[in-house]
UniProtKB/Swiss-Prot annotation:
This is Elongation factor Ts. It comes from Legionella pneumophila (strain Lens). Its main location: cytoplasm. The keyword Cytoplasm applies. One of its GO terms (molecular function) is translation elongation factor activity. InterPro entries: EF-Ts_dimer_sf, Transl_elong_EFTs/EF1B, Transl_elong_EFTs/EF1B_dimer, Transl_elong_Ts_CS, UBA-like_sf.
Length: 292
């Protein structure tokens, strides 16, 4: 059995809100696998919430550029170390220039994009390095998404921290933008029910099964409870099954059917999702600056 460190116990406690002894017990049972420990704690009703999993720590902006015919678009996440720099005009100008060149060149990946030439003659990478030297913070081109369709692409930016692109068939740009706004707010996993990963469904089924057995109800009732909760879960994570944010009385799928439109695909970015950023002690930070 692997040694369970105090730091790992604290990490699980911070993510779940459970007691220290409970966290240690589940980490021992899962040989230190924190993700499996969270699943087991949910089954046992011990995990209050995975508090830390969705925490966005890194700074930066999302930028989108779209062609004039509304059929091609690109979306980028560009990171900085602080929100202050993310709002800096030099940083935002750089980000928008990179998005424009990405739309023009449609690079294969970030590395390819970094080698593209901007209107100034400098490559994206050279311009990035110059900006780092000027601003004094590390700047990173984190990810790039390209989208093309024969219909129309709508997009929505919530400030500069959340960006969504939606490819729509047989619909208007206004409808595509409304759907993009919905995706920004409701965070669906997939477009339709049949696209929900089998692994995700099975994980939820295991959790629901463990929870339902605690009810003491007959097995046939438990089976119905589990099926009902699985169906609810699938609706919650699929775009077409979600209540439409602008009119919760109808689902997105119903809205699209009324408009004779179809969502081909969507992409949602949120600044820093999945990144952990070191949380500095403010006093120590000031003292460090005084000492330098």
């Amino acid at each position: 059995m692997s040694t369970i460190s105090a730091a790992l116990v604290m990490q699980l406690r911070e993510r779940t809100g459970a007691g220290m002894m409970e966290c240690k017990k589940f980490l021992i049972a899962t040989n230190g696998d924190i993700e499996q420990a969270i699943i087991e704690m949910r089954k046992a009703g011990q995990a209050k919430a995975d508090k830390k999993a969705d925490r966005v720590a890194a700074e930066g902006i999302i930028v989108i550029a779209r062609s004039s015919d509304e059929r091609t678009a690109v979306m980028l996440e560009i990171n900085s170390e602080t929100d202050f720099v993310a709002r800096d005009e030099n940083f935002t100008n750089f980000a928008n220039a990179v998005a424009d060149i990405a739309l023009t060149s449609l690079p294969k990946n970030i590395e390819d994009l970094s080698n593209q030439a901007l209107s100034s003659g400098a490559t994206v990478e050279q311009a990035r390095q110059e900006l780092v030297a000027k601003i004094g913070e590390n700047i990173k081109l984190r990810r790039l998404e390209k989208m093309h369709c024969d219909g129309v692409i709508g997009y929505y930016l919530h400030g500069s921290r959340i960006g969504v692109m939606v490819a729509l068939k047989n619909g208007s740009e206004a409808l595509a933008k409304d759907i993009a706004m919905h995706v920004a707010a409701s965070k669906p996993m997939v477009v339709s029910r049949d696209q929900v990963p089998a692994e995700a469904i099975e994980n939820e089924r295991e959790i629901f099964t463990a929870q339902a057995k605690e009810s003491g109800k007959p097995q046939e009732i438990i089976d119905k409870m589990i099926d009902g909760r699985i169906n609810k879960f699938i609706d919650e994570v699929s775009l077409l099954g979600q209540p439409y944010v602008k009119d919760p009385n109808i689902k997105v799928g119903q809205l699209l059917k009324e408009k004779n439109a179809e969502v081909i695909s969507f992409v949602r970015y949120e600044v820093g999702e999945g990144i952990e950023k070191k949380e500095d002690n403010f006093v120590e930070e000031v003292m460090a600056q005084v000492r330098t």
